[in-house]
């Protein structure tokens, strides 16, 4: 049986992550408060950020920048702004 969490991003109950995907206290916070659906949304945004801003995950500054964006997206309700990207209209 899957576990459920009240997702901080989506503001609703959802299926929780199967295991802690990120290290440390932040990883624990994500595991306890973020649903699989919200995590999948973040992964999509993360890929766009890495590609568009040409981030190098070996660079500690780039990792810190990505972590800040992740916290803003998952916990503060801020969307990721990618310069020059226009989402497709519905």
Swiss-Prot record:
Belongs to the Fe(2+)-trafficking protein family. The lineage of its organism: Bacteria, Pseudomonadati, Pseudomonadota, Gammaproteobacteria, Vibrionales. One of its GO terms (biological process) is cellular response to oxidative stress. GO terms for molecular function: iron ion binding. InterPro entries: Fe_traffick_prot_YggX (IPR007457), Fe_traffick_prot_YggX_sf (IPR036766). GO terms for cellular component: cytosol. Could be a mediator in iron transactions between iron acquisition and iron-requiring processes, such as synthesis and/or repair of Fe-S clusters in biosynthetic enzymes. Gene3D superfamilies: Fe(II) trafficking protein YggX. This is Probable Fe(2+)-trafficking protein. Keywords: Iron.
